[in-house]
């Protein structure tokens, strides 16, 4: 029994039983709407691993094992899907020396999907997170971000512009409807039946 307890103590103190994972957490935000129902889909080495459905707070919390390639997809019906790529390959000696990497926080903003705008930029990851030996930490691939950030910004600006135009058209349509409705009420009050019908 004593030998068993000693063995158990050795195992518990071993670096191999330390929780070896990278924590990823954050929030999904949607302007003028709730993130409730957003799906956070996790694929590991090309295979679906997990899926979280968010509540109205939009918070997510993930734990990714080391030595794997992940894609985190943020999806909501009617909205543009965004993908983050995370590679958790870390040299074994680095994990033994420092297994507790600080959590990585992500803030994901989703925009409504629109027609007649090329959204293909979002078929690829909006960011890539990898381990950097010189920092002994995880950081985003700056060269990759520099290559796509302008196109992402231009596409999102085009989406927002179309949404603003659509909202303005809806407001104008509502104004015209209200105007015709009021004319109909006025004609109805004067018992000008045909004029009222034409307005409605």
Locations of regions flagged by a protein language model:
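Bacterial Sec-dependent N-terminal signal peptides
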Residues: 1-27
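Alpha-helical tetratricopeptide repeat
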Residues: 23, 170-188
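Short, ordered, surface-exposed loop/turn motifs in non-cytosolic proteins
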Residues: 31-45, 133, 193-196
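A short, solvent-exposed loop/turn motif at the edges and junctions
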Residues: 47, 73-89
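Short, acidic Ser/Thr/Gly-rich low-complexity loop/linker segments typical of extracellular
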Residues: 47-59
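Short Pro-Gly-centered beta-turn/loop motif in secreted/extracellular proteins
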Residues: 61-71, 77
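Surface-exposed, low-complexity/disordered segments
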Residues: 92-171
């Amino acid at each position: 029994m004593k030998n068993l307890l000693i063995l158990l103590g050795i195992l518990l103190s071993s670096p191999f039983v330390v929780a070896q994972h990278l924590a990823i957490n954050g929030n999904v935000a949607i302007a003028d709407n709730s993130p409730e129902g957003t799906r956070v889909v996790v694929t590991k080495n090309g295979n679906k691993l997990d899926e979280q459905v968010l509540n109205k707070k939009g918070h997510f919390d993930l734990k990714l094992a080391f030595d794997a390639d992940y894609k985190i997809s943020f999806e909501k019906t009617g909205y543009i899907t965004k993908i983050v790529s995370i590679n958790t390959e870390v040299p074994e000696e680095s994990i033994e020396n420092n297994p507790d990497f600080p959590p990585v926080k992500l803030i994901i903003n989703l925009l409504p999907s629109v027609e007649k705008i090329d959204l293909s930029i979002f078929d690829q990851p909006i960011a890539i997170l990898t381990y950097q030996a010189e920092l002994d930490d995880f950081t985003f691939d700056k060269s990759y971000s520099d290559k796509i950030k302008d196109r992402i910004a231009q596409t999102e600006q085009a989406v927002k512009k179309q949404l603003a135009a659509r909202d303005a058209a809806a407001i104008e349509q509502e104004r015209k409807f209200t105007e015709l409705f009021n004319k109909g009420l006025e004609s109805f009050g004067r018992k000008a039946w045909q004029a009222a019908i034409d307005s409605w």
